[in-house]
C-alpha cells in the first residue's frame, strides 16, 4: 500500500535549496521509488499560520520512506536541508482506502 511523506517548511536559503538540495535528493527519490506530487515554496495557507513550503511525496510503502530517511548516504543532504530551512514539520501516512 502506498504511503505519503508530507513536509511543511520555510526555506531560508532558496538558492542553496534549489541548486544543492534538490539535485542531490533526486537520486534518492528515484532509488526509493518516490513520486513528487507537490513541491511548492509559496503554498497558499487556508488555516492557521503554516510554513509556505510544502512537499508531498508518494512512496510504495512506509518502509521505503524510513529507508530513505535512514540511508547513510542521505544524511549529509538531511543536514543541509535542516540548515537551510526553518519551521519544518513532517508526517508519514498510509494511503486511504474507502471502505466498502
Predicted region positions:
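Short S/T/G/P-rich N-terminal loop/turn motif that feeds into the first structured element of a domain
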Residues: 1-53, 59-70, 94-100
Amino acid at each position: 500500500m502506498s504511503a505519503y511523506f508530507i513536509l511543511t517548511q520555510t526555506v531560508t536559503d532558496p538558492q542553496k535549496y534549489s541548486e544543492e538540495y534538490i539535485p542531490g535528493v533526486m537520486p534518492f527519490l528515484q532509488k526509493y521509488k518516490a513520486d513528487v506530487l507537490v513541491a511548492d515554496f509559496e503554498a497558499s495557507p487556508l488555516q492557521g499560520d503554516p510554513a509556505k513550503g510544502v512537499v508531498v511525496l508518494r512512496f510504495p510503502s512506509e518502509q521505503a520512506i524510513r529507508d530513505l530517511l535512514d540511508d547513510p548516504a542521505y544524511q549529509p543532504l538531511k543536514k543541509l536541508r535542516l540548515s537551510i530551512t526553518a519551521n519544518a514539520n513532517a508526517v508519514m501516512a498510509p494511503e486511504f482506502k474507502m471502505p466498502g
